[in-house]
Amino acid sequence: LDPGILEVNILLTHLHIDHIMGLGYFKPFYNPECTVNIWGPAGSSESLIERLRRYFSPPFFPVRFRELSAKINIHEIDNSTFNIDGFTIKSEYLCHPGPTVGYRCELGGSVVSFMPDHEPSLGSSDFPHLSEWCSGYNISEKADLLFHDGQYSNSEYDRRVGWGHSSVSDAIDFGNLSKVKKMVLFHHDPAHTDMQLEEMVDKSIQGKKIDF
């Protein structure tokens, strides 16, 4: 970051290690002139700050949370709406072990939705045909851009139902259901090659009418 930026907002979807392992190396934490606002969900039995303190402690990380130099503000969210520098941000719990939230960020009529870890078919008895009770639909509907979990192929997903991740096929169906304009698939299985990812997408869109 530009050293002249003295206030930063971090939006956490959840606290699995693959999503927070870089926090300890974030330079603004060590600048006493900086204010860092952290937004994220509390755990079922621990507050957000208690969960962050567990990460910022040995053996996970040598610097303890109380030793960080910046002024740190903790904001616990659930199904919430809040504002940051003109952005209206809506958070909503998603189907993923956690607890986990996704985000809908709105500014000037444009909408970006962010759901890196999400299993949309788990929360609905009639997915992908019915939006009611579909996890994440409320914060993705008609988004200009949706970032969405694309972890598995269909065969992989069949063996991992309930793990909190989406197949590429379900992610595309979710994008269609939500009527998004553009979609970015990510949070891929690290064992997949680029060629495999392309093949998964090609197979997932065969025979489907894609509206984005």
Identify the role of each PLM range.
Residues 121-210:
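Cap/insert and terminal regions of metallo-dependent hydrolase folds
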Residues 1-116, 121-124, 137, 194-212:
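Binuclear metal-dependent hydrolase catalytic cores
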